[in-house]
UniProtKB/Swiss-Prot annotation:
Residues given in the record as D-glucose 6-phosphate binding sites: 159-160, 210-215, 354, 358, 389, 519
InterPro entries: G6P_Isomerase (IPR001672), G6P_Isomerase_C (IPR023096), Phosphoglucose_isomerase_CS (IPR018189), SIS_dom_sf (IPR046348), SIS_PGI_1 (IPR035476), SIS_PGI_2 (IPR035482)
Keywords, comma-separated and alphabetical: Acetylation, Cytokine, Cytoplasm, Gluconeogenesis, Glycolysis, Isomerase, Phosphoprotein, Secreted, Ubl conjugation
EC number in record: 5.3.1.9
Protein name in the entry: Glucose-6-phosphate isomerase
Modifications after synthesis and translation: Phosphorylation at Ser-185 by CK2 has been shown to decrease enzymatic activity and may contribute to secretion by a non-classical secretory pathway.
Residue list for modification N-acetylalanine: 2
CDD domains for this protein: SIS_PGI_1, SIS_PGI_2
Active-site annotation: 358 (proton donor), 389, 519
Record GO biological process: gluconeogenesis; glucose 6-phosphate metabolic process; glycolytic process
Its job: In the cytoplasm, catalyzes the conversion of glucose-6-phosphate to fructose-6-phosphate, the second step in glycolysis, and the reverse reaction during gluconeogenesis. Besides it's role as a glycolytic enzyme, also acts as a secreted cytokine: acts as an angiogenic factor (AMF) that stimulates endothelial cell motility. Acts as a neurotrophic factor, neuroleukin, for spinal and sensory neurons. It is secreted by lectin-stimulated T-cells and induces immunoglobulin secretion.
Keyword Phosphoprotein annotated: yes
Catalytic activity: alpha-D-glucose 6-phosphate = beta-D-fructose 6-phosphate
Length: 557
């Protein structure tokens, strides 16, 4: 595929931007078109609640949107989408299909990889998860002393941690009958030490999530957990009642002491950051119940069908992707803020930090050449209204344009004080996107100062600081309620957005070679930290850091 910058449709878009981009003014666009909201929004009726995607507060016209859609079509988005859904090995650097969509394929329509339908295996593992969840949640599954399981500890890292953690936090209101869940990911001993300090080994169940069962951080933490457990249990055979594995390496799992019957497998066509729908989601199913886990899958499947069958012009993941292309590749924006106005979604931005940045943080195209355009954005964010009192200042009056996605449910899980808290939250959500769009003119700021009775001297001093340029782009994503179904749909929507952008940029969104180099060097450095001999085998900075650590350790020992 030719470089994006050589694509005729993109060149047309870029020329239009250079000629007209600086004239786009959101306040004027709204004043000149009373129907703008209706023409630049999608109301998705899932039959389990609505998802409204309002993109009218973006620096776009119908002409711009059509040019963006033309770019998507010319880059082969529709054909690439079908290749993914039909099991082609689109992750070509690892020779793998990309089939997280198969994990939530509620239609059970066959999906073939190398001529074999994967759905029977997917359903077999789901049935095994269902049976296990029912045994644990009912109290039938007992620990070594006969106690039921009260706490589940998921030990994993990256995709084996971020997804289940985000979802179990988001669906806390659905967890009342399930065990508590804990997540240990960091190799920093503090993480597992602080977690284990609160637990009773007799009623704890550890989930060890590692495809190869060789991930250094995960296996080190798992061995620490096993040592802690055996201090109480004494008998190594008790491990089988308290440890299960999410893996494909039967030999290593058995060697650890886990009964292979308690190993839940997944497949090489499941990428880590897309794996919460697989056995990696076992902690989710245990916490909220398998019925709710199935609802999560069903919501994602609904969005998969919307993405696969809806024309690009009305396709939510596609439109979100194209707006990102517009800001990154024309306006030069470098970051994207995800701002959920729901405390249960407090890990949503962190989850898609990995989802987006590990997928599209690439500078090499599929043909092996270096891109001459920007690719994946820096993704960040915090829940509202906390962010308003932290970093919104820069979004409103800073020198950088930061496109933002604002998300909120219409219905709160906790309508306390007759809904007062949620009404205030909704008001802030609505006010922020309007303020970012409209801004505050010099004349409006002047009238405000006059009404406040400020002196003429104050006028001169304060007026420039009270002006807001506005014209800051936002998407508003409003949904009926944060249910398992709606959460599944929202996650899938962003997954597909990332996919579309990767196709347009001609990069492989499904490998992650960038994480490997640091791991390789860490293996070399680890033995060099032993003893007191000075290290000289690296650059002067790395040598200096290693030797400082060794000297300080010696001095304190």
């Amino acid at each position: 595929m030719a470089a994006l910058t050589q694509n005729p449709q993109f060149k047309k878009l870029k020329t239009w931007y250079e000629q007209h981009g600086s004239d786009l003014n959101l306040r004027r666009l709204f004043e000149g078109d009373r129907d703008r909201f209706n023409r630049f929004s999608l109301n998705l009726n899932t039959n389990h609640g609505h998802i409204l995607v309002d993109y009218s507060k973006n620096l776009v016209t119908e002409t711009v949107m059509q040019m963006l859609v033309d770019v998507a079509k010319s880059r082969g988005v529709e054909a690439a989408r079908e290749r993914m859904f039909t099991g082609e090995k689109i992750n070509f650097t690892e020779d793998r299909a990309v089939l997280h969509v198969a994990l939530r394929n509620r239609s059970n329509a066959p999906i073939l990889v190398d001529g074999k339908d994967v759905m029977p295996e997917v359903n077999r593992v789901l049935e095994k998860m269902k049976s296990f969840c029912q045994r644990v949640r009912s109290g039938e599954w007992k620990g070594y002393s006969g106690k039921a399981i009260t706490d589940v500890i998921n030990i994993g890292i990256g995709g084996s941690d971020l997804g289940p953690l985000m979802v179990t936090e988001a669906l806390k209101p659905y967890s009342s009958e399930g065990p508590r869940v804990w997540f240990v990911s960091n190799i920093d001993g503090t993480h597992i030490a602080k977690t284990l300090a609160t637990l009773n080994p007799e009623s704890s169940l550890f989930i060890i999530a590692s495809k190869t069962f060789t991930t250094q951080e995960t296996i080190t933490n798992a061995e620490t957990a096993k040592e802690w457990f055996l201090l109480s249990a004494k008998d190594p055979s008790a491990v089988a009642k308290h440890f299960v594995a999410l893996s494909t390496n039967t030999a290593k799992v058995k060697e650890f002491g886990i009964d292979p019957q308690n190993m839940f497998e997944f497949w090489d066509w499941v990428g880590g950051r897309y794996s919460l729908w697989s056995a990696i989601g076992l902690s989710i199913a245990l916490h909220v119940g398998f019925d709710n886990f199935e609802q999560l899958l069903s919501g994602a499947h609904w969005m998969d069908q919307h993405f696969r069958t809806t024309p690009l012009e009305k396709n939510a993941p596609v439109l979100l992707a194209l707006l990102g292309i517009w800001y990154i590749n024309c306006f030069g924006c470098e970051t994207h803020a995800m701002l959920p106005y729901d405390q249960y979604l407090h890990r949503f931005a962190a989850y898609f930090q990995q989802g987006d940045m590990e997928s599209n943080g690439k500078y090499i195209t599929k043909s092996g050449t270096r891109v001459n355009y920007q690719t994946g954005p820096i993704v960040w964010g915090e829940p509202g209204t906390n962010g308003q009192h932290a970093f919104y200042q820069l979004i409103h009056q800073g020198t950088k344009m930061i496109p933002c996605d604002f998300l909120i449910p219409v219905q709160s899980q906790h309508p306390i004080r007759n809904g007062l808290h949620h009404k205030i939250l909704l008001a802030n959500f609505l006010a922020q996107t309007e303020a970012l769009m409209r801004g505050k003119s010099t004349e409006e700021a002047r009238k405000e100062l006059q009404a406040a009775g400020r002196s003429p001297e104050d006028f001169e001093k304060l007026l420039p600081h009270k002006v807001f340029e506005g014209n800051r782009p936002t998407n508003s994503i409003v949904f009926t309620k944060l249910t398992p179904f709606i959460l599944g749909a929202l996650i899938a929507m962003y997954e597909h957005k990332i996919f579309v952008q990767g196709i347009i940029w001609d990069i492989n969104s499904f490998d992650q070679w960038g994480v490997e180099l640091g791991k390789q060097l860490a293996k070399k450095i680890e033995p060099e930290l032993d003893g007191s001999s000075p290290v000289t085998s690296h650059d002067s900075s790395t040598n200096g850091l290693i030797n400082f650590i060794k000297q300080e350790r010696e001095a304190r020992s």
